[in-house]
Each structure stands twice: as C-alpha cells, then as structure tokens.
From Swiss-Prot:
Gene symbol of the encoding locus: rplU
HAMAP family xrefs: Ribosomal_bL21 (MF_01363)
Protein source organism: Oceanobacillus iheyensis (strain DSM 14371 / CIP 107618 / JCM 11309 / KCTC 3954 / HTE831)
Family: Belongs to the bacterial ribosomal protein bL21 family.
Record-given protein name: Large ribosomal subunit protein bL21
Matching Pfam families: Ribosomal_L21p
The protein's role, per its UniProt record: This protein binds to 23S rRNA in the presence of protein L20.
Cited PROSITE patterns: RIBOSOMAL_L21
InterPro entries: bL21-like, bL21-like_sf, Ribosomal_bL21, Ribosomal_bL21_CS
Keyword rRNA-binding: yes
C-alpha cells in the first residue's frame, strides 16, 4: 500500500518503512508526526480524494534535521560595478514512514 501526501507545498509518494526528506517540520527528533493531507491511497483498495481523503492519515517518525548543500546566488549589473553574492542552505527533515491509515 502506498499514499500520496502533501507537505511543504509538495506532493510525495510514500510507502511504509520508507525514508523521505521533506521541508523542515517543527518537531523534535524521535517524535511522531501525523500528516492528514492525504490525496491518494493506492494498492488493493484504491481511494482518490477530492481533493483530500477524509479520515486518512500518515504517521512518521522524525529521524534527523539538517541543512542542504549551499547554493550561491549572484547578482550582476553590467557597467555599474554592481556585484552581489549571497548563499542559502535550505533546512530539511528526514522522516521514516511508520503507518498509513486509510
């Protein structure tokens, strides 16, 4: 059985036991997180939400928090001696999917 959930403005296909990386979730390490925005449940019994499935949840355990690799943003205007450099590291959360409740 698999499910498609929405978190951090993205839709992610998840299976029980899978490790996923999502936008930062405000929960401590080893804490359980519940996602109630379930869009689709597939497998033997298929359920499609319009847009969400009522009563369906996905629970996951927070394994770690971190920051992605640094990206550099450069701004440049020709002939004006204008150069700007800025870096950014996006925070993420690593989750392990525990259970899909249909």
């Amino acid at each position: 059985m698999y499910a498609i959930i929405e978190t951090g403005g993205k839709q992610i296909k998840v299976v029980e036991g899978q490790e996923i990386y999502v936008e930062k979730v405000t929960a401590d390490v080893n804490e359980s997180v519940t996602f109630d925005k379930v869009l689709f449940i597939g497998g033997d019994d298929v359920k499609v939400g319009a847009p969400l499935i009522d009563g369906a949840t996905v629970t996951a355990k927070v394994e770690k928090h971190g920051r992605q690799k640094k990206i550099d943003v450069h701004k440049f205007k020709p002939k004006k001696n204008y150069h700007r450099k800025q870096g950014h590291r996006q925070p993420y959360t690593k989750l392990v999917i525990d259970k899909i409740n249909a």
